[in-house]
Amino acid sequence: MALSDTDVSDVVDSLSLDEKCSLVRGAADPEGTATGYVPGVPRLDIPELRLADGPLGIRIPGRSSTAFPASIAVASTFDPELARRQGVAMAREAKSSGQHAVLGPGLNLVRVPNCGRNFEYYSEDPVVTADFAAAAVEGLQSEDVIATPKHYVANNQETKRLVVSAEVGERALRELYLPGFEAAVEAGAGSVMTAYNRVNGTHMSDHRRLVTEVLKDEWGFDGYVVSDWFGTASAVGAATAGLDLEMPGISLEALHEAFGIDPDAEMLAEGDDESIPAGETTTPKFATELKPAVESGAVPADRLDDMVARILGQMARIGLLDGEWGDGGALDTAEHRDLAATLAARGTVLLKNDDGALPLSDDADVALVGPGVAEAMLGGGGSSEVTPAREVSALEGIRARTDGSVAFEPGVERVVTPSFFDGGDADSDGDAEDFPGGKTPDVDAAADCAREADVAVVVVRDATTEGADRETLRLPGGQDELVAAVADAADRTVVVVQSGGPVELPWRDSVDAIVESWYPGQADGDALASVLYGDADPAGRLPVTFAPEDSYPTAAEERFPGVGEEARYDEGVFVGYRHFDAADADDEPTYPFGHGLSYATFEYGEAEVRGDDAVAVEVTNASDRDGREVVQAYVRPPTVAGVERPTRELAGYAAVELAAGATETVELTLSEHAFRRYDDSEGWTVDAGDYVIEVGRSSRDVRAETTVSR
């Protein structure tokens, strides 16, 4: 039985000042397995606490674990239950390696399409983000592992992430950037990680209003707040603002030694030397400054007690303090491998499919083109990097599935994701030994190969990483030119895009089909083959908007990357589809939020309001094959003088599997978030009037409407 709050309080009272200070800062893990480590107190039988990186899988140096698809791919399923199952699996893998907390999920909104960590986040929409946040937290914590949603808050770019100030209004914070974290807290998250950046001038580690007044007092968060690594701005400021645990608690040199990182290698910065901790920033604050601050009264003694109690309270909740933690660990199981494959397939989005180009026939002769088809696309660079025990490339998956021939040409040199941990070295020399069969990069050879096949499948990818933002939304390494050359030569061209977020597709009108598979993880080839050959319906829908780079609101320099040390969020709540759907928005998206095709055809009946918070619609699979539809409901608010609101906001969605010819009544619960708005003076308010409920297949594909009054 977990210790009670009274028991934890008694333990805190038994600790010396030195022992208390040792529990609120990290140290070097003697086993070398944990990203973050808190030493125990043997005198009182308080065990160690280990924290592992984990948005895409459990990262343990020198060990393997299941490499799940990127979070943006998971959100593309529009099925939070799958995120819950992933959380369960990741918790079991954490336990198998002796890790008590997982540093995830990542809950920052996709505000900047160029952001290098968009692959770690769910969506540009706060409702989707909140739903998946809650599901992931519930899954992780159901197995007695502490979830750590991050990075609180407004960490929407990597450029100058240590110093940039997100100059953001309260309405945008409340309506867009905070809901995911609030949902995680409501789901019982045991920890929250603060971001590197500043918000309205104050570093998040020292932001008392957001950390104590909003997170702890307003939302009732009773867990501990942990800093990002070297993300503590000051000892006194952070402790009194509400930070409970400083990580890593040791110097950068000691961290390098603990993880075997070459101290002479410069960690990736992509021309932005303030993206990575350096100099004074890497000096631990609590190690030398906290105890004197408590002794002088600068940090109240009861604040230190609260810090310790919050950490011990979560250790008690998962059974660490009474010796009941540890059962249920499992690593690289068949169940986890199957889940990784299911997530990858269901997160695959069919953007375009002219004249039934897909699915492929079993006996089609395929020209498989692309520099990365011989290796699985596991993820982006940074703290989310995972080493799987097994992985399946596109080449392996398609060859195993087809009855036809498969010819391979790389076309261009390999695009390698830079590693955040090896100095950013990315070997892209395209030497022959890099490719199966001694192939060398040659666009003409790729075009010739495509010309001889029934269909050309071109697999292209971007390269994103923590610590740097993409300079452009175009694909790197001449891949756009490769697609154009193949499309010009082939009878039928299918392009598979593996990206960490929105990309520009300048060749889209020249190809027959486009598939977005994001970073599919270890099951890359198996999942791709199942979708291309129709064994699985391409069930994913876009959780972000695809559009030309200069049409996003963050195309303005003052908004991204910012001028000096400020990024102005003066687009307010008009982010993503909210921007593109605005009445005065001239730019049309390439593919709208919620878009995704199916191999089946679906018909919608009339929409019907049910009660105060639900809408129902009949959906029919009008084709001769089974399919999976994602039914979406958007709220269009009434016009209120002097108030700018988005044209529509997502209110609910449901993924439904329908057999050929089947009809089902789908009921969607409508989130109150879509009806209300935040007023700086009055707080949350719902304007009186008629709200139009739009039901359809995307934010732009409305199939039925009804009205509800508030």
Annotate each PLM feature.
Residues 1-700, 705-710:
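Glycoside hydrolase catalytic-domain context in secreted enzymes
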